[in-house]
Amino acid sequence: MTNELQLHQISVSEMDNNCYLLQAGEEGLLVDAADDAPALLDMAQKAGVKITAVLTTHRHWDHVRALKEVLSETGATHYASFLDSPAIPAEVDVELREGDSIKFAGLDLPIIILRGHTPGGAALVTNIDGVINLFVGDSLFPGGLGKTTSEGDFVRLYKDVTARIFDEFPDNTIVRPGHGKSTTLGE
């Protein structure tokens, strides 16, 4: 990967959802069309990009409320984990598995599947200004893991985050969660 990506971010809804727009030239990849489609489309317009891809990190209601409208307005390709896609209220064009990549603006952006918060959330790996950025949905936050509903789910999420994130990436890797502030793996 190169450092061709620029990052734009907006927080929407009463749930304080982070929506991220990755810009490569005139193309945009939106991470989570959580809510307030007009604000998301305005963010893209102000950045001078057309949203050509949308990644839904996981199936929870607060991450998909603007999804149908954004997809309808943009014609973007919709990506989501194959484990969560059956419960996402919009057609998923590409179902992602562990080790897959999203091909966006000539870049291959790796995907990590994180099980536990939902059956299988999709995290996106990028390089922005020479620093690895992980867009993790609600699987990892500053200070700990995302919410789980059973001991088995907690263990799955802990193992996935440990093996697929902490064991693989340096401490200066930026974690960009679905809500709240970003952090680094070393913090």
Task: For the regions a language model picked out, list residue spans one by one.
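Metallo-beta-lactamase
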Residues: 118-187
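Conserved beta-strand hairpin/beta-sheet module of binuclear metal-dependent hydrolase folds
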Residues: 2-47, 123-137
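Active-site metal-binding loops of divalent metal-dependent hydrolases
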Residues: 33-35, 59, 84, 107, ...
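Core dinuclear metal-dependent hydrolase active-site scaffold
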Residues: 20-23, 101-129
